[in-house]
Curated annotation (Swiss-Prot):
Catalytic activity from the UniProt record: L-threonine + NAD(+) = (2S)-2-amino-3-oxobutanoate + NADH + H(+)
Pathway membership, UniProt: Amino-acid degradation; L-threonine degradation via oxydo-reductase pathway; glycine from L-threonine: step 1/2
Site feature location: Important for catalytic activity for the proton relay mechanism but does not participate directly in the coordination of zinc atom: 148
Record InterPro entries: ADH-like_C, ADH-like_N, ADH_Zn_CS, GroES-like_sf, L-Threonine_3-DHase, NAD(P)-bd_dom_sf, PKS_ER, Zn_alcohol_dh
Function: Catalyzes the NAD(+)-dependent oxidation of L-threonine to 2-amino-3-ketobutyrate.
Official protein name in the record: L-threonine 3-dehydrogenase
Keywords, comma-separated and alphabetical: Cytoplasm, Metal-binding, NAD, Oxidoreductase, Zinc
Taxonomic lineage from the root: Bacteria, Pseudomonadati, Pseudomonadota, Gammaproteobacteria, Legionellales
Major localisation: cytoplasm
Self-association and partners: Homotetramer.
PROSITE patterns listed in its UniProt record: ADH_ZINC
Protein location: Cytoplasm
Length: 340
């Protein structure tokens, strides 16, 4: 089958012909229809320090997908050939304390599809049935292909009560933009998103934010004053991994505010802990998606009218994957989809 493989320990991704994956009695085999390129895939393509320390070579990459079931393991229940599906890309052990307590997103033994085990940038993917999400008919193929990152956004955006609250989002990448759409959809008052990338800030405006702020040219404090906010932001969603953005967020928070951290800093990051302690801030780290409550909620939000389509900016046939990766890496895009 056709696949995109990290075949060498150097920058790049290579298209190769590899065997169709075998599947076990508790697995399903999925015919891949659409995939989306993630920031993780760009790290792997670039072969940065994280990728060098994490990715076994060779490795079929990719973890954001839409497809249809073509084979079902003999012990699988509740799924059948022909169903439209996406899937959870974190494979958990099922036996640790958190897994047994129903908190699989906190499994210490997690393996990542397209990271530690073969991924979805291929014509077929074998996946444990427990990780497969059967899709309602009113979820489109494009929406299904980005449910994984949409789930990151939902997990973060729903970490704290945002109804009637003023929300600050630092980082207007695709996940930050989708988080902005979510908090607006569920009842936040003012939603402010910051970045230094004007292209992505414009995408955020299309998603209905109150203000999209380029912090190179405008101060957050001025924006808050213009919106009539006298006491700071109630909820902060840090999506950028930028140390300066994180500290700007701490300064902008109201006393007793809540901060969810999804962005990953590139190095050890100094924080002004006086902002945290004397303001009584609550900080929560966010990783992946809650299994599977986040999946239920994000599909329900799409069914109830949440529109995330503006974040999908490019579609390419898989044979044009090199150009697709370049577009995604440029920062001048939202989500980039490969059609198989």
């Amino acid at each position: 089958m056709k696949s995109l493989v990290k075949a060498k320990k150097e920058p790049g991704i290579w298209m190769q012909d590899i065997p169709v994956p075998e599947y076990g009695v508790n697995d399903v085999l999925i015919k891949i229809k659409r995939t989306a390129i993630c920031g993780t895939d760009i790290h792997i393509y670039s072969w940065d320090e994280w990728a060098q320390a994490t990715i076994p070579v060779p490795m079929t990459v990719g973890h954001e997908f839409y497809g249809e079931i073509v084979e079902v393991g003999k012990e699988v229940q509740g799924l059948k050939v022909g169903q439209r599906v996406s899937g959870e890309g974190h494979i958990t052990c099922g036996f640790c304390r958190n897994c047994r307590a129903g908190k699989r997103h906190l499994c210490r033994n997690t393996l990542g599809v397209g990271v530690n085990r073969p991924g979805c940038f291929a014509e077929y993917l074998a996946l444990p049935a427990t990780n497969v999400i059967a899709l309602p008919d009113n979820i489109t193929e494009e929406q299904a292909a980005i449910l994984d990152p949409f789930g990151n956004a939902a997990h973060c955006a729903l970490a704290f009560d945002v109804v009637g609250e003023d929300v600050l989002i630092t980082g207007a990448g695709p996940i930050g933009i989708m988080a902005a759409a979510i908090v607006r959809h569920i009842g936040a008052r003012h939603v402010v998103i910051t970045d230094v990338n004007d292209h992505r800030l414009e995408l955020a405006r299309q998603m209905g934010v109150s203000r999209a702020v380029n912090v190179k040219y405008q101060k957050l404090s001025d924006v808050a004053n213009e919106l009539g906010m006298l006491e700071g932001f109630d909820v902060g969603l840090e999506m950028s991994g930028n140390p300066m953005a994180l500290n700007d967020m701490m300064k902008a928070m109201n006393h007793g505010g809540h901060v969810a951290l999804l962005g990953i800093p590139p190095q050890e990051t100094p924080i002004d802990w006086n902002q945290v302690i004397f303001k009584g801030l609550v900080i929560k780290g966010i990783y992946g998606r809650e299994m599977f409550e986040t999946w239920y909620k994000m599909i329900a939000m799409l069914q109830s009218g949440l529109n995330i389509s503006p974040v999908i900016t490019h579609n390419f046939p898989v044979d044009e994957y090199q150009h697709a990766f370049q577009i995604m890496a440029s920062g001048q895009s939202g989500k980039v989809i490969l059609n198989w």
